[in-house]
């Protein structure tokens, strides 16, 4: 291809795509993930996967739009996509665009099986963390069938905890913890539930009506899990999932929130088209961090790369891509000239040289040895 097609051609192509093309893009993402991990010599035998759903508000008559949980735009139709991210690398592993309905138990089970089929070959142990929408027997059974550990926020289950088993791990805190094995109606076996209870704050300066029952004096957070260990440590591990909200918000700002057509199948494919671009920028940041490590043994200055691993994708683009330059023709050659007064120019040149050196080396994913690849292709 000599040049990129015009925008209208691109959008006509997107409009012709469907759900099958979207699923094929998930396979492309899986292949790319293994290649990048091999290239960067990453090995994660144990990973944490955080799952979350979000809302994309619709302002037209797009297919699949439903009225549902939409706190910002109550009463409006929307889509309700589900996304899963790997906490260690903050990359997208699986997800799909859905109609704007609450996800069902069977859908959660199918999604967990989908995650299982997308794991890199080096991963042996997985911890799933999800909110109350995944607290169903179908999801629990699927997680156990896949060999995953899980911590799901409770929704709809009302286990009865031993009143004598409450404990405080921190003496300066009034928060108490407990656990109990409970078999909700409709489940085939009991599950472990862990809970924390927080005393409700009393309004000062007003008459206080004492609660008759002890349970009414507390706010409860209950979780279903198959992990062993103290309840407070399990809940603390679940709370680390909060970062997935930032990842979902970042993906939406990168283009996920755009609804390009009125056809659900085309919007489904566009969803999976945006997420590889999101992951590629994640990989560019990982490569930038590696180039910074390599530069420590050379005289190259990459001070502008400092902290780029923790930057958002928008800030990473400002550092690595949005740099003023001039394109000139000289001796029948096209050249790109950067300003010597821009502090980011040396790091950009160093990073491009680092990428060229990596391209000229043997492909790490084609070499024998190391961990087995699940998505190796010729």
Protein language model regions, located:
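Short, conserved catalytic/metal-binding motifs centered on acidic residues
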Residues: 1-2, 6, 10, 45-56, ...
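Active-site-proximal, Lys/Arg-enriched surface segment
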Residues: 3, 7-83
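Short acidic, glycine/serine/threonine-rich loops at helix termini
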Residues: 59-65, 93-97, 107, 137-143, ...
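Electropositive, glycine- and tryptophan-enriched low-complexity nucleic-acid-binding patches
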Residues: 71-121
């Amino acid at each position: 291809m000599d040049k990129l097609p015009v925008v209208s051609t691109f959008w006509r192509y997107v409009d012709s795509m469907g759900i099958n093309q979207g699923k094929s893009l998930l396979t492309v993402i899986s292949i790319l993930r293994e290649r990048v991990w091999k290239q960067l010599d990453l090995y994660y035998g144990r990973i944490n996967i955080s799952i979350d759903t979000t809302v994309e508000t619709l302002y037209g008559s797009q297919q699949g739009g439903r009225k549902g949980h939409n706190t910002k735009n109550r009463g409006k139709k929307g889509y309700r996509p589900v996304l899963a991210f790997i906490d260690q690398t903050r990359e997208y592993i699986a997800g799909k665009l859905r109609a704007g309905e609450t996800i069902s138990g069977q859908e959660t089970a199918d999604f967990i099986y989908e995650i299982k089929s997308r794991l890199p070959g080096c991963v042996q142990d997985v911890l799933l963390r999800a909110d109350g929408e995944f607290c169903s027997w179908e999801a629990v059974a699927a997680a156990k069938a896949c060999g995953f550990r899980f911590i799901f926020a409770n929704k709809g289950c009302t286990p009865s905890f031993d009143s004598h088993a409450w404990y405080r791990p921190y003496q300066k805190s009034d928060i108490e913890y407990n656990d109990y094995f409970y078999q909700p109606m409709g489940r085939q076996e009991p599950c472990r539930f862990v809970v924390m209870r927080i005393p409700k704050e009393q309004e000062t300066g007003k008459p206080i009506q004492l609660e008759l029952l002890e349970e009414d004096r507390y706010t409860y957070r209950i979780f279903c899990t198959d992990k062993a260990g103290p309840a407070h440590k399990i809940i603390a591990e679940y709370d680390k999932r909060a970062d997935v909200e930032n990842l979902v918000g970042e993906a939406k700002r990168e283009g996920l929130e755009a609804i390009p057509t009125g056809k659900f199948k085309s919007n489904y494919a566009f969803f999976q088209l945006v997420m590889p671009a999101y992951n590629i920028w994640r990989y560019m940041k990982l490569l930038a961090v590696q180039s910074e490590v390599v530069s420590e043994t050379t005289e190259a200055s990459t001070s502008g790369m400092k902290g780029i691993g923790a930057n958002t994708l928008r800030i990473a683009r400002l550092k690595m891509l949005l740099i003023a330059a001039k394109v000139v023709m000289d001796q029948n050659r096209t050249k790109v000239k950067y300003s010597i007064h821009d502090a980011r120019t040396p790091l950009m040149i160093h990073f491009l040289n680092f990428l060229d050196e990596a391209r000229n080396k043997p492909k790490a994913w084609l070499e024998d040895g190391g961990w087995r690849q699940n998505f190796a292709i010729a």
